[in-house]
Structures are given as C-alpha cells and as structure tokens.
C-alpha cells in the first residue's frame, strides 16, 4: 500500500475526532439532531483548521443511510463513499480554478435535478471568495431559494471579500486557530498511534511553528520524521526550523542576567554559525522569560516539554526579581519591534542584547576617584621684595596639635591671609608705586583655585590606598514596597479665588436670606430674639429644636460638634430661660437627620431657590435669547447669582 501523509490519514471522520472548534460542532450537532437544517452554511477561518473536514462531516450526517444524524455510522455505502471522495451527490468545487460566470451557470443548471443516491445534493464550494462578481450574482438567486434537496456548504479563508448579500443568506461559522497546547496534544496522540519515537520539546517547537494550523503541524511532522530518520527529535526539529535549542536560548538568558557581555557575544557567534533566524532567536528568549515569570507566579506552570531544562529554569525563577524579568522582556520586545529598521538583523539582535546589558540593575558602579594632588611648600610670606634676603633654613618641626591640619592646607591658608594683608596695605599706600612695581607679581587666581581645592580635600578626606575598598555592586533589594501617597497641595490660583468669591453672599443677600428663614422656621425666629455671643449663636443656628414643657433638646449636626461645650450650653440655657420666663432644661445631642432643617440649612435652601429662579429668569429673558440666537453666545450659568 502506498504511503499516505499524516494530514490525509488522520483527517477526522466524526465530529468527535475534530480538534477544537466546539462552538461550531455543538451548533451543527444540535441542528442535525433537531432537524433544523439550513440550506447554506459558510465556514471561515485560517488554513488548516478544519473547514473542509467539517463540511464533509456535515454532508455525511445529512446523507447517512441511518437517517439525518450528528453521529453517522461510517459503515454504510454513502458514508464510505464520502470518506473516499467519490460520492456522486457531494459535488466539491474549487472556486479558485472555476471563477468564470460560465462555470457557475453550468453548475446551477444541474441544481434542479434530484440527488441520485443520497438524501440531499450537497455543493461544497471551497475558497468561495475567489469567485468573480458575476459568478456571485448568478449564485445569488439560487442561494436564496434553493430546492429542498440542495444544500450549499461554502468555505473561505477571507470572508471579508464575500458580498454582504451572500453573507446574509448563510449561517456563518468562524473556526478559530488552534492554540499550541491543542496542536501539541494531537501530535502526541498521532505519533503514539503511529509508534514513532518523539521528544516533548520537539512537539512543542512543531506546534508553535504551525501558527494555529493543525494541517501545517502534520506536514511539518512528516518533514521532521524524514529529517530525524524515523523519529521526531528536538535537534532535528531545531535544525529544520532554523531555531535555537533550549540550551542555547537559555544560556543567552543566563548570560544576560549575569551581565556577562563576552559570553553573550560568544553565543551570538555560535547562533550565526548555525544560520538561525534572528527574529526567532528573540522569540525564543521572550518565551523563556515568559515561562520564568509564570513559574514565579505558579510553580506548576512549567510543563513536561521543559523537563530537560527544568532545574535551570527554576533556579532563574528563584534568583531573578520579577521587576528584572519585566525589564528584560520589554527590552527584547522593543528590540524585536525595531528589528526591521536595523541595517542588519544580526546587528539589531546584538544591539538589543547590549541594551539589556546596559540597563542591568546590578552592573558594578565604580566609585569616583579623587586625584591626590601634591603641592610644593609655600613660604609664609607670599610677597617678596628685592631687598629681602633668601629664606633661612626651616627650623625643626614643632609638635602637632591635637587635630592637625595637612601641611599643604596650613601653608595655603597662611599664604591667603598674607595676601589679604598685603592687598589692604597696598590700598592704604598708593603713594609708593615704585616698590609695588618692583615686587614679584602674585597670581591671585591660582591661589584662589588652590585654596578651593584644598578646602574640598579637607572637607572630604581621601581614603588611603590600603583603606580603599573595591567597587561594590549597586545595592538592589527585591522586596515589595507600598509607595506613600503624596498629598496634593492645594494651590490658590486667581481663577479659583475668583470662583470662590463669586459664591460668597453679599451682606444684603445674607440679611435677606436670614429674614426669609425667620418667616419659615419658628426656631430661626426664636434664635433671632436671643442675645447670644456669636460663637454660641452658631450652636443654635446649626441645630434644630425639639421642645416638651420646660425641656429643650437641640439636635446639633455632627460636623459642628466642636462648638458644643459646657460654657456654650450654659449661656444658651440662660438665654432661653430669659426669653421664656422660666427655667429651661437644655440638652444637646448630635443628629444628622436630613428630614429636619436647621436655621442655616433653611437659609441655604432659600438661596438655592432664588438661584434657580434667577437662572430661569435669565434663560427666559428676550435679550439673552436674542444674543444667543444671532451671535451664537454661550451662557455661563455658573456665574449666575441671585440678588
């Protein structure tokens, strides 16, 4: 028997054999079971995800001799002929090779005839988006009202190219691209059934290279079996796909984490010798960094495909802080984005890794070295005249004080003091220009620079060669920190001050509000008759009264509790007793009941009523309406104030 490729040999024969696409299979199975069968189905999705296979399974379910079912028997003549591709009532058409309108018309001429053997005549049109505009127009009427014995199954990888009139006449099912784990699991199942030796990491590489297409994965598996001499090995798959193996990619990550630039460049040279795809190199490193981050979150995230490098991955996850992983990941991701703009792909990868090394948080930072400067001894007298004799030999050194100054420092300070004295004497004796002319010139700027350097050296003593410690790495602590929220300072801008002043009530308006509050609130009227200090009066204005016989209870707002004290209660009780003519027992409790208003709340309510009336009056004003209508003026309602 001739060899059959895996993609054809393992084509699904039942709905249960289809990998993924549960959302499509469930809808089709329910429709077949309930007998709710549409006359046109459209399957869309990327290549190799099962569009044609599902369409054939649907045709098998429609024409199985056991009846319309979601689980065809697979043994009757109709099922076997559909599997073998020779069922007379399943007409498969490649629209890419039959795009002319004449081909479509010839096809539609046979639609009216009943099926020869099956229950339905099924037209399976693959790559239907390749049909011409005239072909779509010819198909339109038949697709809208086909005979009862005709079903259309359309498959396309580009549904956007189909006319909306075609889309509206079909049930649309979009097949999703398979994820890497689904493809890897199916490859493992097939290779186990075929008794072919394989490595988990090799299957992971094949599943990732398939990019969501199971057919591409099976084709690559056939190629890997041929490359690996009858088995699927990681080395053969890496060489076939032009990708790095785990050890090399992981070694690059380790060298980058250790800030070992020489090791990184050596590994780059090894990768170049293998002729790998440079973007694939960055993708592999990004994948490893992602796995390391996932292991830090959940130790069980490392799958069986990483068994060969599991220990090294867990060690990296243990030692690298999460912030470093995010830094490396973002650096490599940006490098991959900028790779097309690099003069050379290898150059772009090298610069990306060098950027990661440059931003390494543990790079050694050498301490700044202060150069040790030595100065020649300066004589105490900085200004010499020609009549002076040569300096005498220095006397024996005296005993140093308790806190000695450096010799150079003391000499420079003495020279500066002598210079100041000489300058003062020169100003006083301007009548002796001859002696000043014969004197040796003094470099004032040099002495000032020397003194400033000496002051800095004195303020920060230079460690000796024996005490100088080697350069230390930057202190880098990996610990969770909660940033202290800084309080936003309130800045009083002129605009804010103006707005606040606009809301201030004028004395006339405040008096008018108080008078109207007295008319509406008996307690406000009673407070106006009391002779109280201003601070005690605020207690009464911020409370509402509850009275029974000679007992008065004031319900004070909690925001004004600071006004409530024994002295205020005593003065308020005396004023109430004097007004009533008998002794009043006063109690004050805190109460924020909004149903009862205090005198101040009455004033605010009256103010808001007047403000609403003023706003309505201005809006209804004829002059204002004319300005807004003819000059497109805008009314600033926030500036409206009652008078």
Swiss-Prot record:
EC number in record: 2.7.7.7
Matches recorded under CDD domains: AAA (cd00009), HLD_clamp_pol_III_gamma_tau (cd18137)
UniProt-annotated binding residues for ATP: 45-52
Binding-site residues, Zn(2+): 64, 73, 76, 79
Reported impact of residue 601 to K: In dnaX36(Ts); present only in isoform tau, unable to grow at 42 degrees Celsius
SUPFAM superfamilies membership: P-loop containing nucleoside triphosphate hydrolases, post-AAA+ oligomerization domain-like
One Pfam family hit: DNA_pol3_tau_5
Signal peptide coordinates: none
InterPro entries in alphabetical order: AAA+_ATPase (IPR003593), ClpA/B (IPR001270), DNA_pol3_clamp-load_cplx_C (IPR008921), DNA_pol3_tau_IV (IPR022001), DNA_pol_III_gamma-3 (IPR022754), DNA_pol_III_sug/sutau_N (IPR012763), DNA_pol_III_tau_dom-5 (IPR021029), DNA_Rep/Repair_Clamp_Loader (IPR050238)
Disordered: region residues: 385-404
Chemical reaction(s) catalysed: DNA(n) + a 2'-deoxyribonucleoside 5'-triphosphate = DNA(n+1) + diphosphate
Quaternary assembly: The DNA polymerase III holoenzyme complex contains at least 10 different subunits organized into 3 functionally essential subassemblies: the Pol III core, the beta sliding clamp processivity factor and the clamp-loading complex. The Pol III core (subunits alpha, epsilon and theta) contains the polymerase and the 3'-5' exonuclease proofreading activities. The polymerase is tethered to the template via the dimeric beta sliding clamp processivity factor.
Function summary: Part of the beta sliding clamp loading complex, which hydrolyzes ATP to load the beta clamp onto primed DNA to form the DNA replication pre-initiation complex. DNA polymerase III is a complex, multichain enzyme responsible for most of the replicative synthesis in bacteria. This DNA polymerase also exhibits 3'-5' exonuclease activity. The gamma complex (gamma(3),delta,delta') is thought to load beta dimers onto DNA by binding ATP which alters the complex's conformation so it can bind beta sliding clamp dimers and open them at one interface.
NCBIfam families: dnaX_nterm (TIGR02397), PRK05563.1 (NF004046), PRK07994.1 (NF005942)
Family: Belongs to the DnaX/STICHEL family.
Protein name: DNA polymerase III subunit tau
Organism: Escherichia coli (strain K12)
């Amino acid at each position: 028997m001739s060899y059959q490729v895996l993609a054809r040999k393992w084509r699904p024969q039942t709905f249960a054999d289809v990998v993924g696409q549960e959302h499509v299979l469930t809808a089709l199975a329910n429709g077949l079971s309930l007998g709710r069968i549409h006359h046109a189905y459209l399957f869309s999705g990327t290549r190799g995800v099962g569009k044609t296979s599902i369409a054939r399974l649907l045709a098998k379910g429609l024409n199985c001799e056991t009846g319309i079912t979601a689980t065809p028997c697979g043994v009757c003549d109709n099922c076997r002929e559909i599997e073998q591709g020779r069922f007379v009532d399943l007409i498969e058409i490649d629209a890419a090779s039959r795009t002319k309108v004449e081909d479509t018309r010839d096809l539609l001429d046979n639609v009216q005839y009943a099926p020869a053997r099956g229950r339905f005549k099924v037209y399976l049109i693959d790559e239907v988006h390749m049909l011409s505009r005239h072909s779509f127009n010819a198909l339109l009427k038949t697709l809208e009202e086909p005979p009862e014995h005709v079903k259309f199954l359309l498959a396309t990888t580009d549904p956007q190219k189909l006319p909306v009139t075609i889309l509206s006449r079909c049930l649309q099912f979009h097949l999703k691209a398979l994820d890497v784990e689904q493809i890897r699991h199916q490859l493992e199942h097939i290779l186990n059934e075929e008794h072919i030796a394989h490595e988990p990491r090799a299957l992971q590489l094949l599943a990732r290279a398939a990019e969501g297409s199971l057919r591409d994965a099976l084709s690559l598996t056939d190629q890997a079996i041929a490359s690996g001499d009858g088995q699927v090995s990681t080395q053969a798959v890496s060489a076939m796909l032009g990708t790095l193996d785990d050890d090399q990619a992981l070694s690059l990550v380790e060298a980058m984490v250790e800030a070992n630039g020489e090791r990184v460049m050596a590994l780059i040279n090894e990768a170049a010798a293998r002729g790998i795809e440079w973007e694939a190199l960055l993708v592999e490193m990004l994948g490893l960094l992602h796995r390391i981050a996932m292991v830090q979150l959940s130790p069980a995230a490392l799958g069986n495909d990483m068994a060969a490098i599991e220990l090294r991955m867990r060690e990296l996850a243990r030692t690298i802080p999460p912030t470093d992983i995010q830094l490396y990941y973002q650096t490599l991701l940006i490098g991959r984005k900028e790779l097309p703009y690099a003069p050379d792909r290898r150059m772009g990868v090298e610069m990306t890794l060098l950027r990661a090394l440059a931003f390494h948080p543990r790079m050694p930072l050498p301490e700044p070295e202060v150069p040790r400067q030595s100065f020649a001894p300066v004589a105490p007298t900085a200004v010499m005249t020609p009549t002076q004799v040569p300096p005498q030999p220095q006397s024996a050194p005296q005993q140093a004080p308790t806190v000695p100054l450096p010799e150079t420092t003391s000499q420079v300070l003495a020279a500066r003091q002598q210079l100041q004295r000489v300058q003062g004497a020169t100003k006083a004796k301007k009548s002796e220009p001859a002696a000043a002319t014969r004197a040796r010139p003094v470099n004032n700027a040099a002495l000032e620079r020397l003194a400033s350097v000496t002051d800095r050296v004195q303020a920060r003593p230079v460690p000796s060669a024996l005490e100088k410690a080697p350069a230390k790495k930057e202190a880098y602590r990996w610990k969770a920190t909660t940033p202290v929220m800084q309080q936003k300072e309130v800045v009083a801008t002129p605009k804010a001050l103006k707005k606040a002043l606009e809301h201030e009530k004028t004395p006339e308006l405040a008096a008018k509000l108080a008078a109207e509050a007295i008319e509406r609130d008996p307690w406000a009227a009673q407070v106006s008759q009391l002779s109280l200090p201003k601070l005690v009066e605020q207690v009464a204005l911020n409370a509402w009264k509850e009275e029974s016989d000679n007992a008065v209870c004031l319900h004070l707002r909690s925001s004004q509790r600071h006004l409530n004290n024994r002295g205020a209660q005593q003065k308020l009780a005396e004023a109430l007793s004097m007004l009533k003519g008998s002794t009043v027992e006063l109690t004050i409790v805190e109460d924020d009941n909004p149903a009862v208003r205090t005198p101040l709340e009455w004033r605010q309510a009256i103010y808001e009523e007047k403000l609403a009336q003023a706003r309505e009056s201005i809006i209804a004003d004829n002059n204002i309406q004319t300005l807004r209508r003819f000059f497109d003026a805008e009314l600033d309602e926030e500036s409206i104030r009652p008078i």
